[in-house]
Amino acid sequence: MAKEVAGKLRLQIRGGAANPSPPVGPALGSKGVNIMEFCKQFNAKTQDRIGKLLPVVVTYYVDKSFDFVIKNPPVAVQLLEIVKLKSGSAEPNRKKIAEITWEQVKAIAEYKMADLNCFSVEKAIQMVIGTAKSMGIHVKRDFSEKQLNS
């Protein structure tokens, strides 16, 4: 028999850096989840991704137990890593702060495909381009129609 789900909680935590202080502690503690056990398990599972911002979906049950799923870093974080900046443009429509190539966009889309709510790489690429535009990052489009479909 399956456990009865009490709820789900979404957090963004740096890999290997979960601790009981805010925002993790209060968010989990108010739901009755064992904070120290979560921190130990999360830090153990994210040893290979230390320092990266990781979205986590915590499912907590009526019996105070929990499960969690670690997703890939957000597209915005990956874009900022590629262009080596700390934040996007304050005026993305007027001021472009960086430029990325089509190959980099495609690589991010393929990497994030499992976490995005789309079924084709082309749609995932459009989502990545939209995120880049909203951050003031220009996508260099030096490709033919043949490359678009490959």
Swiss-Prot record:
UniProt keyword terms in alphabetical order: Methylation, Ribonucleoprotein, Ribosomal protein, RNA-binding, rRNA-binding
Keyword rRNA-binding found: yes
Subunit structure: Part of the ribosomal stalk of the 50S ribosomal subunit. Interacts with L10 and the large rRNA to form the base of the stalk. L10 forms an elongated spine to which L12 dimers bind in a sequential fashion forming a multimeric L10(L12)X complex.
Family stated for the protein in its record: Belongs to the universal ribosomal protein uL11 family.
Protein name (database record): Large ribosomal subunit protein uL11
UniProt keyword Cell membrane, yes or no: no
PTM info: One or more lysine residues are methylated.
One family name in Pfam for this protein: Ribosomal_L11_N
GO MF, one example: large ribosomal subunit rRNA binding
Function: Forms part of the ribosomal stalk which helps the ribosome interact with GTP-bound translation factors.
One GO cellular component, as annotated: cytosolic large ribosomal subunit
